[in-house]
C-alpha cells in the first residue's frame, strides 16, 4: 500500500531533498493550511454557526463585508502573527498592513491574502476560497508603522516564493506552488490533514471553455469583444471549434476548474472600471493566481502585460486579468497589440 503524502511531508521533501524552500517557509505554509482548515470548518457550519449574512461593515474597497469575510480574516491573522515566520501581513479586508505585535518574534516573510474570495456566493452555498501569496521581506524594510510597511509589499509577482488557494466546496482542497510545479492536496477531515492527491498539474494549452461575466459585454474593450465574438461563432468561425461558457463569479472556483481541465478566465478592462485600473486586486488575487497558472504551464496577462512583471504602486492596486490555457491567453493578448 502506498503511503499517503501529507502536506507536511511534501514540504519537508521540497526543503530537504530539493532545497526549494526554507524551514521557516515550510512552517509558514503549514500554519496557513491550518487556518484554511479552520475556515473550512466555519463555512461548513453555515447557519448553524451563526456565520452567514452581512457583517454590517465595508472593507477598504467599499464592498459590504460578510460575517465570514471578517471571521476568515481574523482566523488568518490570529494563526500567523505569533509563529515567528512573518514580518507583516496584508489582506483585502484591511486598509493597511498588519504588523506582527512586539510581543512576538518577527520573521523574514510577508503574507498577503484574500481571506474569502467569492463571498457573495456564501449564502447560496457555492464554492468559495482563500487566496494567499508569500514574499520575502526586503532587508532593512521600514516596519515601524503600518503606513511605512506598505512599501515592503510592493514587489512584482516574480518575487513570490509561494502562492496558493484553498477551495471550500464538496471537498476542501489546497492548491499550492513553491516554485516547483503545482500540487493539489485534499483535506482528510478525520485525520485533520491535507493529503497530496495530484502533483505536477499541467493545464492543456488549448481549450473549448471560457469564463467571463457576459453581462459586462457592452463595456469591454475591442480586443475582448473580438475574441468572445469569435468563440460564440463556434466552429464556423476563425477559431474553428465550438466553445462552452462557465461562470461561477468566484475566482477560486473558476480558476480551479481551469487548473483541472483547462480553459480561459477573463476579467478584462471595461469602461465602467477603467478609472480604478481593473476589477481584481494585483497583490492577493492576480499575482498568486498568475504564479500558479504559469507553474502549471498556462499564461496570465492583463491583455497587454504579463501579470507577474507588474511593479505594484499600491497595496490594493487593481488590474485586468486574462489567464489559463496558454494558446488562448496568447491569442487574446495578441489581439490587444494588433
UniProtKB/Swiss-Prot annotation:
Keywords: Carbohydrate metabolism, Cytoplasm, Hydrolase, Magnesium, Metal-binding. Mg(2+) 1 binds at residues 92, 114, 116. Its EC number is 3.1.3.11. Binds 2 magnesium ions per subunit. Substrate binds at residues 117-120, 213, 279. GO terms for cellular component: cytosol. GO terms for biological process: fructose 1,6-bisphosphate metabolic process; fructose 6-phosphate metabolic process; fructose metabolic process; gluconeogenesis; sucrose biosynthetic process. Pathway: Carbohydrate biosynthesis; gluconeogenesis. PANTHER family: FRUCTOSE-1,6-BISPHOSPHATASE-RELATED, SEDOHEPTULOSE-1,7-BISPHOSPHATASE, CHLOROPLASTIC. This is Fructose-1,6-bisphosphatase class 1 1. The gene is fbp1.
Amino acid at each position: 500500500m502506498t503511503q499517503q503524502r501529507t502536506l507536511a511531508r511534501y514540504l519537508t521533501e521540497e526543503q530537504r531533498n530539493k532545497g526549494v524552500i526554507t524551514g521557516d517557509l515550510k512552517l509558514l505554509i503549514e500554519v496557513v493550511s491550518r487556518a484554511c482548515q479552520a475556515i473550512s470548518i466555519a463555512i461548513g457550519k453555515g447557519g448553524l454557526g451563526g456565520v452567514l449574512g452581512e457583517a454590517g461593515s465595508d472593507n477598504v474597497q467599499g464592498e459590504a463585508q460578510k460575517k465570514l469575510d471578517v471571521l476568515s480574516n481574523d482566523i488568518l491573522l490570529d494563526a500567523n502573527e505569533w509563529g515567528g515566520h512573518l514580518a507583516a501581513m496584508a489582506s483585502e479586508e484591511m486598509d493597511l498592513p498588519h504588523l506582527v505585535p512586539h510581543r512576538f518574534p518577527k520573521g523574514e516573510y510577508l503574507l498577503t491574502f484574500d481571506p474569502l474570495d467569492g463571498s457573495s456566493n456564501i449564502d447560496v452555498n457555492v464554492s468559495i476560497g482563500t487566496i494567499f501569496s508569500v514574499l520575502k521581506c526586503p532587508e532593512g524594510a521600514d516596519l515601524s508603522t503600518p503606513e511605512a510597511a506598505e512599501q515592503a509589499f510592493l514587489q512584482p509577482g516574480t518575487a513570490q516564493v509561494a502562492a496558493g488557494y484553498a477551495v471550500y466546496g464538496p471537498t476542501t482542497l489546497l492548491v499550492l506552488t513553491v516554485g516547483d510545479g503545482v500540487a493539489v492536496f485534499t483535506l482528510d477531515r478525520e485525520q485533520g490533514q491535507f493529503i497530496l492527491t495530484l502533483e505536477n498539474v499541467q493545464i492543456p494549452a488549448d481549450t473549448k471553455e471560457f469564463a467571463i461575466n457576459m453581462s459586462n459585454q457592452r463595456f469591454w474593450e475591442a480586443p475582448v469583444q473580438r475574441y468572445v465574438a469569435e468563440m460564440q461563432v463556434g466552429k464556423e468561425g476563425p477559431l474553428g471549434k465550438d466553445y462552452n461558457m462557465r461562470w461561477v463569479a468566484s475566482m477560486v472556483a473558476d480558476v480551479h476548474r481551469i487548473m483541472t481541465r483547462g480553459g480561459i478566465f477573463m476579467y478584462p478592462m471595461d469602461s465602467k472600471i477603467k478609472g480604478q485600473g481593473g476589477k481584481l486586486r494585483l497583490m492577493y488575487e492576480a499575482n498568486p493566481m498568475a504564479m500558479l497558472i504559469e507553474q502549471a504551464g498556462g499564461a496570465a496577462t492583463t491583455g497587454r502585460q504579463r501579470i507577474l512583471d507588474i511593479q505594484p504602486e499600491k497595496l490594493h492596486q487593481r488590474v485586468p486579468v486574462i489567464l489559463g490555457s496558454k494558446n488562448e491567453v496568447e491569442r487574446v493578448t495578441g489581439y490587444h497589440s494588433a
